[in-house]
A protein has these predicted regions:
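Conserved beta-strand signature within the Rossmann-like core of class I S-adenosyl-L-methionine
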Residues: 132-139
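C-terminal alpha-helical "lid/dimerization" subdomain adjacent to the S-adenosyl-L-methionine
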Residues: 41, 64, 139-199
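A conserved beta-strand element that flanks and buttresses the S-adenosyl-L-methionine
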Residues: 108
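A short, conserved alpha-helix within the catalytic core of class I
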Residues: 116-125
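Conserved class I S-adenosyl-L-methionine
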Residues: 49-58
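Conserved alpha-helix/loop element of class I SAM-dependent methyltransferases that forms part
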Residues: 30-48
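Class I SAM-dependent methyltransferase Rossmann-like catalytic core
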Residues: 15-36
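Class I SAM-dependent methyltransferase SAM/SAH-binding core
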Residues: 59-96
């Protein structure tokens, strides 16, 4: 009888191993601090005891912590539902928020809009759905260096998790245009968001991040 040699099993590709190692390093050095800073910054703008819709919530971890601090009733929506989430999550089509006009106290986007093809359209949807506030954490890109830095940050933080990366960054002027077109009044626009420890903050901080609280202006 002729023995058949077993074919060697293909192991993980070098690129996949590199991305996983990079993701673990990012999580260890940056993720915990990022969560803490974001929760503090966002909770300052969420109506106490209100209702919060978190768009692009992922596993809902940050939204859950914000709700715990503010007493808000929170629910998330996303284009896909993860097996385990920290909050209830509904699916949506990525374009129309599945809620009625002025049906929740606040709508939040946490590093979501730059992953979408048309941030302005989603901002208009948030203005329609939110009664009191639209809260946005995202990036500012004013020049080629900003764009390159944000691309690198996005790749390191998201590529290991298979996140789609359109690198759709906007300048402050573009964000303000989107807010105005949606009928949103800027109540706060904070660019001092200390997500990174020194010396990383000198490269990856420097005004590349913002947290904004916007108020829907009805009847204009």
């Amino acid at each position: 009888m002729t023995e058949t040699a077993e074919m060697p099993q293909a192991g993980p590709q070098p690129g996949a191993l590199w991305r996983k190692a990079l993701g673990r390093t990012h999580d260890r050095l940056i993720f915990s601090r990022r969560v803490q800073v974001l929760v503090e910054a966002l909770a300052a703008h969420v109506p106490q005891g209100g209702t919060l819709l978190d768009v692009g919530t992922g596993d809902g971890h940050i939204a859950r912590l914000v709700a715990d601090r503010t007493g808000a009733e929170v629910r998330g929506i996303d284009i896909m539902r993860r097996p385990r989430t920290h909050i209830p999550v509904d699916l949506f089509d990525g374009a129309v928020l599945p809620r009625g006009d002025a049906s929740v106290d606040a709508v939040s986007f946490v590093d979501v809009l730059h992953h979408t093809p048309d941030p302005g359209a989603l901002i208009r949807e948030a203005a329609r759905v939110a009664k009191d506030a639209v809260i946005i954490k995202d990036h500012l890109s004013e020049n080629a260096l900003d764009h390159a830095t944000l691309r690198a940050m996005d790749w390191v933080g998201n590529a290991p998790h298979g996140v789609v990366l359109p690198y759709n960054y906007a300048s402050r002027a573009q964000w303000l245009d989107w807010f105005a077109a949606a009928g949103l009044e800027v109540e706060a626009f904070e660019t001092r968001v200390p997500l990174y420890p020194f010396p990383l903050s000198a490269v990856f901080g420097r005004g590349l991040h913002f947290v904004a609280r916007l108020r829907p202006v009805r009847g204009k």
